[in-house]
Design a protein with these regions (language model features):
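Helix-biased detector of long, well-ordered alpha-helical tracts
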Residues: 1-177
Length: 177
């Protein structure tokens, strides 16, 4: 079936094992996924240090734009609509960066609830403060064009979540990726 082929592709892509399933009768399709694993070197989300730099592994905001397209809250041409809805349904999780990040990150978290919400979880749990420069927060060229053309606020798009980029801090003297 198409579902089992897709699950097989994801297992190969992310080097995971699908160990079983839970079958229930329903007239709707439903999935529940539980992930269990082991880690030798854990980067916790509450170990930021004073004067750490803040990093983001990739662009923010595309997923939220995709959600707005799906909810018919914003109209875009067909090509851009497909681009953004794909980002919403299939975020590009950068697993290949994780080994590099854990070499020097003091703390990290995935951006699932939005940049500001997840940064607050990571930093404010330690009663630290932070300063962000909006111009330095990465967004795609597609999103930049739309924000400029429609005169929309960047902060609204980077703060809504579902981007699944890695947000992390590292000391200034650490080597960068």
């Amino acid at each position: 079936s198409k579902i089992s082929k897709s699950l097989n592709q994801e297992q190969n892509k992310y080097k995971i094992f699908l160990g079983g399933g839970d079958t229930v009768f329903s007239n709707k399709l439903s999935f529940t996924i539980t992930s269990i694993g082991f880690a030798n070197d854990i980067v916790y989300r509450n170990k930021a240090k004073i004067n750490d730099d803040i990093y983001i592994s990739g662009n923010l905001g595309d997923s939220y734009m995709g959600l707005l397209v799906l909810k018919n809250k914003i109209k875009l041409n067909n090509l851009l609509s497909k681009y953004f809805t794909k980002k919403y349904f299939m975020p590009n999780i950068k697993f290949e960066l994780l080994d590099q990040i854990k070499k020097f990150a003091n703390t990290s978290i995935d951006i699932s609830d939005g940049l500001l919400a997840d940064l607050d979880k990571m930093i404010n749990s330690q009663k630290l403060s932070y300063k962000l420069f909006l111009k330095d927060i990465p967004i795609s060229n597609n999103l930049k064009k739309i924000l400029d053309f429609k005169k929309l606020s960047k902060i609204n798009y980077i703060s809504n979540g579902d981007d699944y980029q890695v947000l992390f801090t590292a000391s200034k003297n650490k080597m960068r990726i």
